[in-house]
Amino acid sequence: MDKAALLLSVLLAQTPQASLDCKASGEDFVYECTVMLMRGGQPLEGAEVTIGADMPSMPMAHSVKPAKARPGTRPGEYKARLELEMLGEWAIRLRLAGPVRDQLILHYEFDGKGATPRKP
């Protein structure tokens, strides 16, 4: 493996990875979300996580006020209440601070039950 490929693999291993699980709360367009953060194959603990959302199909028309996530019960788990403006595809923006500073964008389709991952 050459030096550039090795450096790239090290950087990618240290880049935070996130998964999102959102369930409808029973209120219109309100979801209870669980974010799982990993870094280098290990749970990312001690992060300050802010979750926001933008609707890609309507730039600057629908933007959700960011909410601060709270630590969950498992390592790398964070929970937040996400209040959207309508159903459809949303770009979920995770801002991370603390042991790592980064921003992750996840694309999800929200319906009346919850959220499903989408490709950007």
Residue ranges of predicted features:
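Contiguous segments within soluble domain cores/interaction surfaces
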Residues: 13-120
